């Protein structure tokens, strides 16, 4: 049995199979307080249960009749927090924990009215993955342990609460909201957001939540959501979570998206105005199968969540927009992977698909290895066995393991039987999973559209065409990203200015384009972008953008001191997930 080194829980003795929350959200004191009722399955005759907690105040623990139970918070362990050890009576099947969060509850980000679009009310959201749910709920915080849950959440009357379960579509005059999730999920998939929110339906099963002034833009941007859902079902079977809604969060949200069941949490940086960045939503939707339905049992197996999801996301995009479109995504993803491998070192164990994260924060494994190397492995299997056979395998895989958590080794033994792999094929798979880097002879993905982009760039750099003369009117975001990423490092400032004057990259509303431009133009000495860089880092907290930009600043002599000063100013506006990565960066310096 796989042991989760990132949880104090002992599921071989006691397993939580249902959680009931009754919580009050206090914006003035910036804390959540109330009770968690946990129903227990007593697997062995052990007389204690261990829950995961971090930065929680525990006031009292009782059984279902209100009889106090003896408890203690054990010694704190870095990253993991403290085990809450509770003594059980022989007939205890339910425990009630009375508790509150603290300033150290790093899943929570409390935003002031000034950090929201509306500017009138605060905002709260949670981010549980990987092991932060324990900072706002005492529970068994392991991806290998699944349970159903329900919740009563009490919030200020001018706000709406939404969760990763059944959701309201309008504000409640009393500020009292009830939720339930009747399918067993791991702890990291419990999420809460509270703010001045409105809802708009997009289709029979889809809708969007956002602050009122963002709602119209979000409705347009996610107009293809119902089609995406149908495409996903056509590929890999029925959607089993009833509704699929998206909430657009304030810009400090640390990720592009988070696949909370029934309600994807999304960054506003994907609102580009032209639906060009919605592959991120296809990714989170795909997680409704890979990750939420079939989950990595430990964080060492994270690639099972993400490799499958990237593969599935690109298949959705291919079915909606064609092979050329999906090929562009594959090339950009491959570029990110090569950069990550170079960063980690091509012999590093961190470039294995199966990780060894014991004694480390599992967040360390959340990079492009799991996503892009994982996807490349699945593409290799597709090539080996043919798309039709591989699609059938994936359908069977999701059905067979539905609502369970599995290890890499479970995957290997299942695929070996299902696809009747030869000894040589198994060897190839194991090399991908347990060896570093990617095979040297692996051909890089190609995109015919990007070849045309590269030709256009060559004409510009060689001086044959000015920026104004480039034939780019029909380009997608992905073509622009290829163009900007491929600009040579020794490009002249005159050329950079010509591009910027023509295409307004420095202040682009498209966050991916603006990020790529800042990463390219600032090291080249293009001073006009410096103000835009400061503004972007002061407003956006998405780690994918913020961490590389600060890393880049520290390598540019004129900005090295400024980077530290700017981080001191912006740090309080970022979520703890982003702060942790940046603190490491600046402490290493």
Region annotations inferred by a language model:
Residues 44-45, 65-68, 90-92, 169-176, ...:
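Short, glycine- and charge-enriched coil/turn segments that flank and shape catalytic ligand pockets
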């Amino acid at each position: 049995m796989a042991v989760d080194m990132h949880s104090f829980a002992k599921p071989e003795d006691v397993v939580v199979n249902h959680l009931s929350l009754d919580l009050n959200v206090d914006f003035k004191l910036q804390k959540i307080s109330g009770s968690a009722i946990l129903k227990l399955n007593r697997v062995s005759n052990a007389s204690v249960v261990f829950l995961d907690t971090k930065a929680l105040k525990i006031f009292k623990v009782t059984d279902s009749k209100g009889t106090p139970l003896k408890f203690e918070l054990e010694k704190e362990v870095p990253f993991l927090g403290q085990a809450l050890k509770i003594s059980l009576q022989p007939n205890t099947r339910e425990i009630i924990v009375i508790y509150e969060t603290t300033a150290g509850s790093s899943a929570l980000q409390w935003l002031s009215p000034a950090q929201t679009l509306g500017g009138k009310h605060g905002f709260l959201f949670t981010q549980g993955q990987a092991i932060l749910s324990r900072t706002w709920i005492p529970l068994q915080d392991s991806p290998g342990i699944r349970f159903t849950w329900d919740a009563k959440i009490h919030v200020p009357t001018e706000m709406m609460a939404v969760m990763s379960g059944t959701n309201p579509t309008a504000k409640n005059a009393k500020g009292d909201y009830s939720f339930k999730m009747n399918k067993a999920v791991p702890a990291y998939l419990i999420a809460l957001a509270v703010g001045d929110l409105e809802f708009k339906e997009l289709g029979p099963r889809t809708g969007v939540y956002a602050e009122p002034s963002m709602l119209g833009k979000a409705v347009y941007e996610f107009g293809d959501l119902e089609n995406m859902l149908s495409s996903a079902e056509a590929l890999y079977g029925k959607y089993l979570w009833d509704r699929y809604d998206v909430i657009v969060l304030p810009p400090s949200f640390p990720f592009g998206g988070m696949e909370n069941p029934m309600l994807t949490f999304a960054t506003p940086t994907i609102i580009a105005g032209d639906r060009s960045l919605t592959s991120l939503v296809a990714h989170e939707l795909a997680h409704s199968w890979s990750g939420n339905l079939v989950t990595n049992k430990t964080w060492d197996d994270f690639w099972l969540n993400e490799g499958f999801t990237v593969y599935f996301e690109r298949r959705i995009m291919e079915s909606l927009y064609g092979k050329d479109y999906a090929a562009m995504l594959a090339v950009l993803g491959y570029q990110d992977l090569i950069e990550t491998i170079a960063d980690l070192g091509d012999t590093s164990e961190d470039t294995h698909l199966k990780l060894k994260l014991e004694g480390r924060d599992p967040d360390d494994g959340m990079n492009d290895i799991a996503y892009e190397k994982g996807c490349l492995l699945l593409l290799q299997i597709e090539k080996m066995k043919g798309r039709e056979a591989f699609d059938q395998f994936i359908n069977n895989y999701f059905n067979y393991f539905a609502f369970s958590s599995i290890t890499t080794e479970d995957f290997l033994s299942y695929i070996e039987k299902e696809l009747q792999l030869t000894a040589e094929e198994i060897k190839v798979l194991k090399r991908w999973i347990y060896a570093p880097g990617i095979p040297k002879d692996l051909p890089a993905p190609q995109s015919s559209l990007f070849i045309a982009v590269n030709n256009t760039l060559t004409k510009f750099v060689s001086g044959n065409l000015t920026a104004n003369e480039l034939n780019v009117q029909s380009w997608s975001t992905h073509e622009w990203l290829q163009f900007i990423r491929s600009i040579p490092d020794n490009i002249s400032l005159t050329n950079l200015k010509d591009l910027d004057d023509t295409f307004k990259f420095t202040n682009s509303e498209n966050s991916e384009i603006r990020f790529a431009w800042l990463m390219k133009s600032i090291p080249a000495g293009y001073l006009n972008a410096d103000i835009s860089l400061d503004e972007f880092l002061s407003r956006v907290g998405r780690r994918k953008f913020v961490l590389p930009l600060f890393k880049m600043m520290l390598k540019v002599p004129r900005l090295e001191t400024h980077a530290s000063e700017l981080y001191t100013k912006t740090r309080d506006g970022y979520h703890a997930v982003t702060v942790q990565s940046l603190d490491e960066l600046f402490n290493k310096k």
